[in-house]
Amino acid sequence: MDSDRLDLAVVGAGLNGSLLALAAGEAGLSTALIDRMPLKSFTDAGFDGRTTAIAYTSQRLFAALGVWPDLADQAEPILDIRISDAGHDGRPSPLFLHFDHREAAAEDGEPAPMGWIVENRFLRAALQHRLAACKQVELIAPDEVIETRRDPDRAELFLKSGRRLAARLVASAEGRLGAMREEAGIGARAWSYDQIAIVLVARHERPHRGVAQEKFLPGGPFAMLPMRDGAPHEGLAGEHRSSIVWTERADLARRLLELEPPRFQAEFARRFGDHLGPVEPVGPRWWFPLGLVHAERYIDTR
């Protein structure tokens, strides 16, 4: 592959950019995937504590691209979903919505999971493994696009390393604050929800049995997503775990994040409830301000 004259250049090696580059490469398109960070850093345990819910159709795509074999042992099926509400006093309602996977048959008519929960680090590692094996994809990282020149036939990318690439099409997968969107003159509407999502892993006494739960509390949604039991090499052998996305008003979330472990544990357990027995957070706490960026358009010259 002439890596300097490409069919596609993808800027940004996150989940979306990596998946796009792999799909293009597997379709026979000469592709470059560029990111300013070393790719190994994306799979470090401390990089990102989030998980991803993979829907049934997305799982079929991962399987078709050869990614799923590396994920199957790390993916926890979602068999049921329960959604409940709480009043302004924070007390949970005794009523809830229940979605059962047995009522959502797959194409062959047999019950199938409603989705799978996978840690982002394992998802990135599986994508990187397949990308490294795809001869039509060149991984360029760490490196950075410092200038672009575009015309109706192609785009030229000038990299910080001094390298120059020409591609028939460029895709920006840099995220909501991507520099290429701004360079292309594509405006965006943005606003903050004045909320913060606290992300962590919790261990609990009883198994979750593949049930994903979400409580709509006064401060925001509190999601409990089923994870695989802990692995021996992580010091969590056999421990029942859930991924937590705990949304609160920004001011309250900041105060919660500053609490000492015993007080944080008490606030967390009060929201989680006792349906899985004693529960406690394990490992780091991550936090993400919540907002929305909506681009005015999603295409431009090349």
Residue ranges and their predicted role:
Residues 2-4, 74-183, 191-196, 252:
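Conserved N-terminal helical subregion
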Residues 6-33:
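N-terminal Rossmann-like FAD-binding beta1-loop-alpha1 element of flavoenzymes
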Residues 16, 39, 177:
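Conserved Rossmann-like nucleotide-cofactor binding loop
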Residues 25-50:
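Glycine-rich FAD pyrophosphate-binding loop
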Residues 46-88:
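N-terminal FAD cofactor-binding segment of flavoenzymes
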Residues 97-100, 217-292:
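Conserved FAD/dinucleotide-binding core of flavoprotein oxidoreductases
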Residues 177-213, 220-222, 250-252, 268-272:
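Central beta-strand plus flanking loop segment that forms part of the substrate or channel wall
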Residues 288-302:
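FAD-binding beta-loop-beta segment adjacent to the flavin cofactor pocket
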